[in-house]
Structure formats: C-alpha cells, structure tokens
Amino acid sequence: MRKFCAIICLLLITTPVVHAGGERKTLFPDLAPGLHLYRYDWAVETCVLYVAEMSRHEPTLHFEVALANAQVLGKETVRSMADRRTQRGDRHVLVAINGGFGVLGDMRGYGGVLENLHVQDGELITQPTDTEACFGVTESGEFLSTPVQMKANVQIGAHALPLGCINQRRLDGCQVTLYTPRLGESTHTNRRRGTEILISGLPLPLTPNYVHSYRVEDVSRDGNSAIPRDGAILWISTRLKDASVSKFNTGANGTLTLTLSPPEWNRVQHAIGGRIRLLKDGKINETLVEMHRAEKRHTPGKRASVLNLSHEPRTALGYNADTLFLIVADGRQPKYSTGLTLYELASILIELGATEAINLDGGSSSTFVINDAVINKPSGQREREVLNAVFITADIP
C-alpha cells in the first residue's frame, strides 16, 4: 500500500512552473484547502527540495509536533509517528517532517533525548536550550519565535534550588533535573553522580506556567530510579554544594514553580526547538552571512568539516504573516541533489517568502512525508528513525 501511495504521488505532479531561482512542480494539488505542496528544483546548484506551504488563515489546518514512541527515550520513523497521530481519529496527518536534534545513538541508555524545547498538546516535555531557535503555536493560532527561556525552581522549606533541566541527560550541564514519566521507565542515571528524590502529589502532565506542591516519598543514591506513572524524580548533582539538599527528607513538603519567558510562551500548545535561527525579521542570521562571506572558495555540492558550510540534506521550518513553510532538501547524492549550506537554505526560505525560520535536524534524518508516503530521497537510502516530528494536520469531519 505504501509503495502504491508513493507511485500515485509521483503521478500527481502538475506542469512545472519556472521561477527565478528554479522550477516548481506541484504535488497533490487537491489534497486540502489552504495547502500547497511542491518539489522545488533549485537552479543555482544541483539541489532538490520538497516544500509544504500551509495557509495560516485556513481553520481546518493545524501545526503539531510528535514525540517518538510517545516518550523521550527511543526513536521512531516520521511515517510511523504520523500513522499513530492519524489513528487518534480527530485529525489526519497530511504532511510530516523530521524534527529537532538530540541523541541518535544509545549514549548509555539516553538514546532519544532531545536537546531543545518540545511542547506537545500543552505538555512541557523538555525545556528550551538554544533559546533563539524555538518555534511555538498557541491555542489561538499565534506563531511564536521570540527567544524563550525556562525559569524554574524547587522549594523545600525556606530554601529553593534552581531547576535547570527537564528530561535531559545528566551530562548536559544541569545540576538539578526533573524526570517525568514522559522520559521513560527509569532515569538512567549513575549512582555516583547525584541524589534522586522521589516526589508525589504533582498533577501531570507538566505544563508551562506550573506551580504545585509536592511530597518527598523517598531519597536514594542508587541511581537509575524507576519513574512512577503518577510522580516524578528530582535528580540533584553531587557537585551542587547547597545546604538545602539536606532538607529533602522522606515526608518533607515543597513546591515546584516553573514558567517560560516571555509570558506568551506559557500559552503554547505545540512547540519545537532546533539549532540555529536561520531568519529573523526577513534577514539571514548574521553569523551565517559572515561565514558565507569568509569562505575562500565556494565549491557547489562540496561537503566540509564546518557543518554550516557543508552541503548537506537539510530540514527547516519557516513562516510569514500568512504562511507556514516546512522544507526538506535532499543531499549527498551528486547526480540528483547535493544538499545545501545553511546560508543557502536561509536564502531559499527568503526566496519562498519566509521572514522567520529555524534549522531542524538534517543529514540522514531529513524526511518529507505526504499522506503516509516518503516523498523525498533520504541520503541513507531508507527512512531513518528520529526523535520527534512536525505535522500539518487536517480536521476529520
């Protein structure tokens, strides 16, 4: 059935339209009102892109994100995540692309951990780290891409500890991390590195703008604690020299306070973090501009040790006042598509009309799915399992 869908997709291509930067071939012209899908053959260099343009004014279309296997740990293909979302029955996934960066290997059990923001159906699953490269949509449909930070602390008695991470590896620099059931079955921590505190009484799921009391049920230094389905684990690094750590005793009560800043981010229903802001106010990231100018010799299609300057498969998300853009550029296939540098990717986004954009995970992860069929040609010759995904969904009547 999936092969059949892919064949049909290739047949449903309208007459090519030539633009200044290349040729556009519309795909599935009647798939949904307010949705424009096309293949874009970039004329400047050998690169093939797949683009979805969603009208922000079409009430039946929606932006969503999805977590692999519905938890942080583990990986899943974009197509499988889209299938699971459609099976819920209220909306159908029309377009799906791969999402953000994180641990693709095992990394001592942390395979699947995201490195940046992920909010799904109003649940805060991981906090923002690259604060410039985040995108979110509120329940009212407002698009947000302003720099965002998490401000959080864990109070115990008169003392407060800053909470730095949610569902992250202990190696990511945080001295206090909260693990919710959304991570997986256990924390995968090392017993020599910190103290783990089992807390109860926190209403789940965790959300932005969250304030609730909790009770300490257990304190352990064994590591890799099981995460209860109705509670959480607070991990505190042994490097944190704070007298308040000794206050976490069984039976003690405290308060967890969390908010995103600026405050409009507390209203997001779906949000995702990438790596590197490509566009802001219609202008390319100045760092990318400077790197492009400093490049001594630009060789089309060349891969480089500096990833920003290397021609690679790319995935990006952009928007303007009227349109959401999801883009995947194929690469590492010289006779078909060599890929793009990040400066080139940003330039194409401007050409298409985007004013704001962030870079998502690329390389072998870059995947573009329409109606359960992988449309692009992933560089690994097969669809890769990834960490999260971005959807355009449509209401099911």
PLM segments and residue spans:
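C-terminal segment of classical bacterial N-terminal signal peptides
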Residues: 13-19
